[in-house]
Every structure is written in structure tokens, then in C-alpha cells.
Amino acid sequence: MSRRNPCKFEIRGHCLNGKRCHFSHNYFEWPPHALLVRQNFMLNRILKSMDKSIDTLSEISGAAELDRTEEYALGVVGVLESYIGSINNITKQSACVAMSKLLTELNSDDIKKLRDNEELNSPKIRVYNTVISYIESNRKNNKQTIHLLKRLPADVLKKTIKNTLDIHKSITINNPKELTVSDTNDHAKNNDTT
């Protein structure tokens, strides 16, 4: 009985050729070396998905390096403002990743103070509650929050981003001492240009 060669796609993950593939997918026929390579690959994949120190955003949510260079050039707020204004070709994906980072910077207690200062029937209370719920969701699982934001229609996402940016600006105006990392970078860039 002749043994067929193991499928190289199956060794490194999963073969998508189906019945058209003429190589062996039967692990019992594979030589020990091929089994070890597959086992090592699968164990590394499991380890990577469990390790919190490794940034798996790009694999899980599709955040590519392009998104990160846009963010580096424009800053988190710049990416979001560009997405709202439909400039700089910012994708929905990169806007959602930037939104998640902005939500990480925001403190829900500051927003609750702003909410408590509003009148009872003010429509802003609903906006504050929405942003607070996104902050809490992002704190628990930022990848899931990015996924939820991506599923929003574009106009709803833009409105949510605009409301969040307005809240972020009002908080930074009220608390000028609490500058975020992105704000300090912007101030440093402005000082260099003058």
C-alpha cells in the first residue's frame, strides 16, 4: 500500500481545497515528522490566543498595520475626526479600533458627573448613558466592543463617535490637568513646529 504525502495546508492549519486536494488528510497515514509539525503549529495557535501580553487584535478583529500607521500619524482623535468627515480614507475598522482606545482613556465617573449636571428631560442623558455602557463593555472585553462597533451602520457609528468626541473634549476642558497620552504628544508636536 503506497502512502500519499501529507497535505501541506493541513499540516499548517486547514486545507480549503476539499475533494480537489490529492494529498493525505488522514493523520494515521502521516509520518511522525508531519504530525509533530502540525501539533506544534496548533499548540502555538492556542498559546497565542490565550496569552494576554501578545497583541492579537490584528488576527482577531482584522486591525492591520495600516490602521496603526494612520493612528500614529493622526492620533486617536485625528483618526476618529477623519472618519466622521470622510477624509484621509479611514476605514470603519480603523475607526472602531481608535474608538476602543478612546473609550479606554475616558473615565465613566467624569461622564456621570456631566450627566448629573443635566436636567432630567435632557436628551444628553441618553447620550451619556450610551457612552458609559460602551466604556464598561470596552473595559471587560475590548475585542468584543470593536466587533459590536463594526456591526453598527456607518451613520450610527459616526454619530456615536461624534458624541464620544464631544464628551472627551468637554472633560478635557473641565479637567485640564488630566491630559491623556495622545494630548501630551500633540502638545509636544505643536511646540516643535513653533
UniProtKB/Swiss-Prot annotation:
Q: Name one GO cellular component term.
A: host cell nucleus
List UniProt keywords, sorted A-Z.
Activation of host NF-kappa-B by virus, Elongation factor, Host cytoplasm, Host nucleus, Host-virus interaction, Metal-binding, Phosphoprotein, Protein biosynthesis, RNA-binding, Transcription, Transcription antitermination, Transcription regulation, Viral matrix protein, Viral transcription, Virion, Zinc, Zinc-finger
SUPFAM superfamilies per the UniProt record, alphabetical? CCCH zinc finger
Q: Name one GO biological process term.
A: regulation of viral transcription
Chain positions of all zinc fingers (C3H1-type): 1-28
Positions of the UniProt region annotated as Binding to the phosphoprotein: 126-163
| Protein family per UniProt | Belongs to the pneumoviridae M2-1 protein family.
Q: Self-association or partners: how does it assemble? A: Homotetramer. The homotetramer interacts with RNA. Interacts with the phosphoprotein (P); this interaction is required for protein M2-1 function, localization in host inclusion bodies. Formation of a complex host PP1/M2-1/P allows P to target host PP1 phosphatase to the M2-1 substrate. Interacts with the nucleoprotein (N). Interacts with the matrix protein (M); this interaction directs M localization to cytoplasmic inclusions comprising viral proteins L, N, P, and M2-1 and mediates M association with the nucleocapsid. Interacts with host RELA. Interacts with host PABPC1 (via C-terminus).
What does this gene product do? Acts as a tetrameric transcription processivity factor that binds in a competitive manner to RNA and the phosphoprotein (P) to prevent premature termination during transcription. Transcription anti-terminator that enhances readthrough of intergenic junctions during viral transcription. Preferentially binds to poly(A)-rich sequences. Plays a role in the association of the matrix protein with the nucleocapsid, which initiates assembly and budding. Also, can activate host NF-kappa-B through association with host RELA.
The protein here is known as Protein M2-1
Gene this chain is encoded by:
M2-1
